[in-house]
């Protein structure tokens, strides 16, 4: 494989010295960019865009042409695994993702196959290989998956949810069925991420978007336990280099210590967690990624720079920080504000690295 020219993102995840704090943005390939909208229109719909390796590669590279980002992230969706299990993923205008055949009981779980990443999910691996080739070693490529709990919420609820009553009913009334589903998903995610790593992903991230809706006890049992299983099963070295793993539970700031015990390399923080506090608690074990409120990108560039300075000062001197937003970038953010954010991180962070 091509020699990596900019490895500061990988180095920061492993708490190794860097010249400036690396930065990328969750959903950096997305609807805030006019060129993304044009490519998506060309593809026809969202899943067609995900399934076309050349177009998925194009949208992955678009933000890198605009901004000096320190990593690319695979353009895909967390719901590829449930889709490959046969649940019939479709997107309803204004509704988000839906499934034609949601999981309602243990019998449904028993019927679910564990998808072969190079077969039913081969289009994702083709995209990874294409992106790695086209990146030409400029920056590392991040692969990702949803967490078992988060995937299960969509599969059991039949789509997006605000109250999560359907999956919580299963969790409390038929926990055995839910554990069977989560176990199957943990196996599927492990295979899927390992296939991404073999195809060329240089780091992987597990997005636990809905872990924060659980009680602490339920989080340990129904979300973290299965993420820990995945981390245990991941390829941690490929192509002669360590493959760092980041866990991100949105709303999970109270559980950082438990998350750091999984053996992951880094934790993602949302904007509700104080980064100085997070570093005091777990900075000796893991790197931290985050954590500016994505809505800050609506502010004037001078205010964005102030916020970047505050977060950098909060983390403080030394290694182990990857700058990011606390969740995905909003679709109506002015692209030049995202540019001001990226520039500010690089310009203001050099003083923290000796």
Curated annotation (Swiss-Prot):
Highest taxon of the lineage: Bacteria
InterPro entries, alphabetized: UROD/MetE-like_sf, Uroporphyrinogen_deCO2ase_HemE, Uroporphyrinogen_deCOase
Pfam families listed in its UniProt record: URO-D
E.C. code: 4.1.1.37
GO cellular-component term (any): cytosol
Pathway: Porphyrin-containing compound metabolism; protoporphyrin-IX biosynthesis; coproporphyrinogen-III from 5-aminolevulinate: step 4/4
Keywords: Cytoplasm, Decarboxylase, Lyase, Porphyrin biosynthesis
Gene3D superfamilies: 3.20.20.210
UniProt record, GO biological process: protoporphyrinogen IX biosynthetic process from glutamate
Residues reported to bind substrate: 27-31, 77, 154, 209, 327
Primary localization: cytoplasm
Keyword hit for Lyase: yes
Annotated positions for site Transition state stabilizer: 77
GO molecular-function terms, A-Z: uroporphyrinogen decarboxylase activity
Subcellular location: Cytoplasm
Catalytic activity entry: uroporphyrinogen III + 4 H(+) = coproporphyrinogen III + 4 CO2
HAMAP family: URO_D
Subunit and partners: Homodimer.
Described purpose of this protein according to its UniProt entry: Catalyzes the decarboxylation of four acetate groups of uroporphyrinogen-III to yield coproporphyrinogen-III.
Family: Belongs to the uroporphyrinogen decarboxylase family.
Protein name per the record: Uroporphyrinogen decarboxylase
Species whose genome carries this gene: Salmonella agona (strain SL483)
């Amino acid at each position: 494989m091509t020699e990596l020219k900019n490895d500061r993102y990988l180095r920061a995840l492993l708490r190794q010295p860097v010249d400036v704090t690396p930065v990328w943005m969750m959903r950096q390939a997305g609807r805030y960019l006019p060129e993304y909208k044009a490519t998506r229109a060309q593809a026809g719909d969202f899943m067609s865009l995900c399934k076309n390796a050349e177009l998925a590669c194009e949208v992955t590279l678009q933000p890198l042409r605009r901004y000096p980002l320190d990593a690319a992230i695979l353009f895909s969706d967390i719901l590829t695994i449930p889709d490959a299990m046969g649940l019939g993923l479709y997107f309803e205008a204004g509704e988000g993702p839906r499934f034609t055949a949601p999981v309602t009981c243990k019998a449904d779980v028993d019927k679910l196959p564990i998808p072969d990443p190079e077969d039913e999910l081969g289009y994702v691996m083709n995209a990874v290989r294409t992106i790695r080739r086209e990146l030409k070693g400029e920056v590392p490529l991040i692969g990702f998956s949803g967490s078992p709990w988060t995937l299960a919420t969509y599969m059991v609820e039949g789509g997006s949810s605000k109250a999560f009553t359907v999956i919580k009913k299963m969790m409390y009334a038929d926990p055995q069925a839910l554990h069977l589903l989560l176990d199957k998903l943990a196996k599927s995610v492990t295979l899927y991420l390992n296939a991404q790593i073999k195809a060329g992903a240089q780091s992987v991230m597990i997005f636990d978007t809905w872990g924060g809706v659980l009680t602490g006890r339920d989080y340990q049992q129904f979300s973290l336990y299965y993420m820990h299983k995945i981390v245990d099963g991941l390829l941690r070295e490929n192509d002669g280099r360590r493959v760092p793993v980041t866990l991100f539970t949105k709303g999970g700031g109270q559980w950082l210590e438990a998350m750091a015990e999984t053996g992951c390399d880094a934790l993602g923080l949302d904007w509700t967690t104080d980064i100085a506090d997070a570093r005091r608690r777990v900075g000796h074990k893991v790197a931290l990624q985050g954590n500016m409120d994505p809505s800050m990108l609506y502010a004037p560039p001078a205010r964005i720079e102030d916020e970047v300075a505050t977060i950098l000062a909060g983390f403080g001197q030394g290694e182990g920080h990857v700058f990011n937003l606390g969740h995905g970038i909003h679709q109506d953010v002015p692209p030049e504000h995202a540019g001001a954010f990226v520039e500010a991180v690089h310009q203001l962070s050099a003083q923290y690295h000796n």
